[in-house]
Amino acid sequence: MKLLVVESPAKAKTIKGYLDDEFEVLASIGHFRDLPEKGMGIEENEDFSVKKWEVDNKKIDPIIKTIKKSDEIFLALDPDREGELIAWHLIEICKEKKLTDNRSFKRIEFSAIRKEDIISAIKHPREINQNLVNAAITRRFLDRFFGYKISPITKRRTIFGNSAGRVQSPTLKILCEKEKEIDLFIEKEYWELDITLNDKQNNNISCDLVSISNKKFDKLSLENKVQAEKLKEKISNSKFLVDNIVKREKQRQPYSPYSNSLLLQDASSKLGFSPKYTNALAQQLKDGDGLGGLGALITYHRTDSNRMKKSEVLKLRELISSSIGKNYVSEKEIIYKEKSKFVQQGHEAVTPTQLKRKPEDIKNKLSPDQYKLYDLIWKRTIASQMKPSKSLETLYYLKSDEFILKASGSIKTFDGFKKIYNFSDGKDDSQTLPNLEKNEKLEVKKLDIKQNFTKPPNRYSEAGLIKKLEELGIGRPSTYVAIFTKLEKNSYINIKNKSLIPTGKGKILVKFLDGFFDKFVDYGFTADLEEQLDLITESKLNWKSTLNKFLEILNQTVDQVEKQSITQVIDKINENSSEILKEKDCRKCKDGKLTIKFAFSGPFVGCTNYSKDQNGCTYSHALGENDENKDLSGDGKFIGIDNETKQKIFLKVGRYGRYLETLLDDGKAKRTSIPKKMKNEEIDIDKSIKLLSLPRKIGEHPESKKLITASIGPYGPYLKHDNKYVSLKEDDVTEIGINRAVELIDKNIKSKQDILIGEHPSTKKKIVQKKGIKGRPDYLSYNKKNFSIKDDMKEKKISLEEALKIIDEKISKKKEKRK
């Protein structure tokens, strides 16, 4: 028997259909052996030995069971460092279990799930590439050292910053530097000219102003309407003639096939897909499962290469010649230069597995989004070996006594690669110009002026940030999406309208790291580590020396930072926070200074006269992207007067967000939080009175006869019934009625009901299937102990037989450990 191991079940299913019955194909489902979840787990000595690798037995047991019945084991994990590491781990586990004798373990790789590629790979196996393994282990160890040494001190010195990462933190720094540019941006007014001239045939020609009195015109130089009107009058009264005519052929070269980063960027700009979604779709197209029997449609997608195999290039050129036309094939084979000098060996571009398989021919077997992505990949691949597009560009320079105008236009003469891949990027959009002669006279037909304002820099989108990371040499294709996910999960960024926006936590964390661990968030240092990993892959650098040097610098830095107090940390952050502390003096008490302060909920701006006994100044406002709430700081916004209490109501903002405040009869302040989804403009006097009157009684539950109330707590609006709480995600806490409240409560009760499975035959004690809280999976409860449920059982009611097996297995394992 022969066993072939891949990473995903979908890929295993597709490959199984290509092989003989003597082959069994199983999936590792990613990594199954890693550093322990808790603790460093690595000996800080010259060997960097691991105390104990943590193994996921659920993943590895079926593979080990099949290995015992197999003579040949083909390790067909992904053709990258991580795939090599998984293959190495499997062999190491087999060595520990003494399963390597009389069995051959062969490493094979293929970039596409094509039958011929798989058969060829099986015929040409290789040994495990220890250099790739060393690079993967080094990356994992670097990440562990960075996280486990810097994260704890980050938590101790900032209170809120619970996570730092080798690639994650420099990435966050990129976003924060862009946000600082935006915060410091000062808007500037300028006026724009829209000039249209007429020739003798009355043709309209749109022009741009180039120079005034032989000085280059700066479009930002018209700072107000008076200046614009004055210039408009001068140009309108001028007579123009054609001073110079420039005609030239312009070519647009085709684009290379996709690497992973280029695919993520293009799918975002052209299809509107997020990088995470694009990778998920590409995985489906690569694995081939669930595609109506089509098999794998594209090659390996987590690649940093844009090159194609020579044999595939020849097929592609023949296809262009036969199906599009001989005159569309490029004169000679186009060889694209790799963007990175450290592209992993064996990697190829993301291309269709079968070039002749046109998107429209298989459209009915794909989902709409699968089709769109395949169509994009197919067109880009076909276009990569086609001729350039050509156009004739014409420039007219039009001169008066004082001004020079320029009119430009172009005419397409040959569509070339754009016949297939014709996505407009705006670069070729231009007017069609009439034929003008030298010294021909033209008159101003229309001249409009328009007020404009300079705009701050755009925030990064996920695709834009990937491009920036690639330019800086930070991260690799397999890590990009994971970086964004982790930053968002840790509340360091928010993603709104496709823009990545640092939160207050993210901004101050970067200031702390940049102030005290500056080398470790330096782009050059991070990129150099990536290069070192690539050099380890090529056997040009010893992996242990990389770890030793990194640890030496890291340990020295940690020792220095440990000596800094929180006060010293805050002082240094204040020095580098001009964009946050634009106001120096407290607007409430007038004699205090504004400073950044730390809390478990995150950083905030407060007054130096603040004291915990509430006798000092209470001014504060949260940090974050919600700059529109800064005006609510201090005294806040006056909403109106409550006719019943005759007290003023103010809308304010503090470190925990927005709230309403009024005074009670005894002079004490009464406050209530504002639901996050409620906009400031919705909060009028009536809404304010209703919010301040919370909690409110809604009525009795018809079955329990117990009171239902509505209120707002630290986690938002909620219903309370029978000492249990139900979150209000969509409903208005001030308006929800009894019928809707009962509906939500009953739904919540039903979703959390325990299921009695039965009694244990030995002890006669009950076995109950319980619902996990806060999105956690279900579990079994028996004899006052909890038992995890296997992944494939989480969505169904468990039988008594299955429950007994889970419980007895866990109890027996514990007994074995005691021995």
Set out the residue ranges of the language-model regions.
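Basic, low-complexity terminal or inter-domain segments flanking catalytic cores
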Residues: K2, T14, S151, L184, ...
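Conserved nucleotide-binding/hydrolysis micro-motifs of P-loop NTPases
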Residues: P9-A12, I29-D34, P79-G83, S111-E116, ...
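Conserved short loop/turn motifs at secondary-structure junctions
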Residues: M1, D78-D80, I159-G161, K247-S256, ...
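C-terminal or mid-to-C-terminal helical accessory/interaction module adjacent to the motor/catalytic core
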Residues: I113-I195, R248
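Short acidic, hydrophobic short linear motifs in intrinsically disordered regions
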Residues: V242-V246, Q253-A267, G292-T303, P456-K468, ...
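Glycine-centered, phosphate/nucleic-acid-interacting loop/turn motifs that mediate DNA/RNA or nucleotide
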Residues: D289, A296, S491
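Metal- or metallocofactor-binding catalytic centers and their adjacent structured scaffolds
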Residues: K216-S256, E440
